[in-house]
From Swiss-Prot:
It comes from Saccharomyces cerevisiae (strain ATCC 204508 / S288c). This is Large ribosomal subunit protein eL31B. The gene is RPL31B. The keyword Ribonucleoprotein applies. It is found in: Cytoplasm. Component of the ribosome, a large ribonucleoprotein complex responsible for the synthesis of proteins in the cell. The small ribosomal subunit (SSU) binds messenger RNAs (mRNAs) and translates the encoded message by selecting cognate aminoacyl-transfer RNA (tRNA) molecules. The large subunit (LSU) contains the ribosomal catalytic site termed the peptidyl transferase center (PTC), which catalyzes the formation of peptide bonds, thereby polymerizing the amino acids delivered by tRNAs into a polypeptide chain. One of its GO terms (biological process) is regulation of translational fidelity.
Length: 113
């Protein structure tokens, strides 16, 4: 899998409404965090997924049961610089502020490094 070796950043729209359907009110925000980690793991192919504090605030801003229907996410696959790291790559997930997340496509973001 040569595709997993590169460092890449993409923007996704995740539909949390369908992933949280049927989840009891007091477990919706914690389940949203788990579902975002699962989504990033699936799309980036990394076991190590880290969430930005801003993303956590975006999930929880309307309380435990008022999670947004859709969130726009920027997921970056980066190299792990720690010497004793189990995985060579990790994913970093942060929110993207948009007026409406409806109808947006997945795009590759060019990094200015």
């Amino acid at each position: 899998m040569a595709g997993l070796k590169d460092v890449v950043t993409r923007e996704y729209t995740i539909n949390l409404h369908k992933r949280l359907h049927g989840v009891s009110f007091k477990k919706r925000a914690p389940r949203a965090v788990k579902e975002i980690k699962k989504f990033a793991k699936l799309h980036m192919g990394t076991e190590d997924v880290r969430l930005a504090p801003e993303l956590n605030q975006a999930i929880w801003k309307r309380g435990v049961k008022g999670v947004e229907y859709r969130l726009r996410l920027r997921i970056s696959r980066k190299r792990n610089e720690e010497e004793d790291a189990k995985n060579p790559l990790f994913s970093y997930v942060e929110p993207v502020l948009v007026a409406s997340a409806k109808g947006l496509q997945t795009v590759v973001v060019e990094e200015d490094a």
